[in-house]
A protein has these predicted regions:
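C-terminal "post-core" interaction segments
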Residues: 1-237
Length: 237
């Protein structure tokens, strides 16, 4: 399955595509699945979690530390007025219990405040399917952000082989929630991160592929994909 991005303007459509794929895998009894995140520059953690819900064979929570800085660019300030009111209403309903209460405390803190919140997400999907077969992940230097989190999870949970070249990030985590600003003097638009996501107790080391394979000049001129060729050889063996 090619995952070109975790960013989609149509969240429901994206999730339906993932649901459809794993429904077919389950129905046909497929025992080997390949996830290709080469060139996937990331997107929403919510969509990454949806993919993980299908391959989380050990049933563990997806744990991430979110390091926020309160600003006009954080995800709470970019919510619509209706969604912001809905968030406050839900938080006050359970306060001071639950993860949403920690988010509410951060939301009410002064601009410039920093806070670290541990999210422990219980992964689930509407089809209640957990694929437990062989799983392989393809990565390259343009696998970024949420793709880094996927690769880190893959290695940490020994979910399968990681094939290709190291992704753009380490086992320690990545950055997210991109915001666009325009520099005051030059008027040049830039995109910056407003959030750091860190895996629990991971060292700052690269995510080394199980099998390192990179394109050669000959591969490029012939339009050949060396990773796919390698997988074909494995299949024949």
């Amino acid at each position: 399955m090619g995952l070109k991005s975790f960013e989609s303007r149509r969240e429901r459509k994206y999730k339906r595509g993932i649901n459809s794929f794993f429904k077919k895998v389950d129905r046909k009894g497929i025992s080997k699945v390949i996830l290709d995140v080469r060139g996937n520059r990331g997107g929403y953690v919510l969509l990454l979690e949806h993919v993980l819900s299908y391959i989380n064979d050990k049933g563990e929570t997806f744990d991430l530390n979110y390091l926020y800085k309160r600003s006009k660019l954080d995800r709470f300030e970019t919510l619509s007025r209706f969604k912001k009111l809905d968030f406050v209403k839900k938080a006050l309903r359970v306060y001071p219990k639950g993860m949403i209460s920690k988010e509410y405390d951060f939301y009410k803190s002064p601009m410039g405040s920093m806070s670290s919140i541990l999210y422990q997400k219980k992964l689930s999907n509407p089809l209640d399917i957990t694929y437990t077969g062989e799983c392989t992940l393809l990565t390259n230097g343009l696998s970024m952000s949420a793709s880094v989190l996927l690769a880190s999870w893959f290695k940490d949970h020994n979910r399968g082989q990681v094939i290709g070249t190291p992704c753009f990030g380490s086992m320690q985590g990545t950055h997210g929630n991109a915001a666009r600003i325009v520099l005051e003097n030059s008027r040049i638009p830039i995109t910056i991160s407003t959030l750091k996501l860190s895996s629990i107790e991971q060292a700052l080391i690269e995510i080394t592929p199980t099998k390192k394979i990179q394109y050669s000049i000959k591969d490029l001129t012939m339009g050949r994909d060396p990773l796919i060729e390698y997988l074909k050889v494995l299949k024949n063996e």
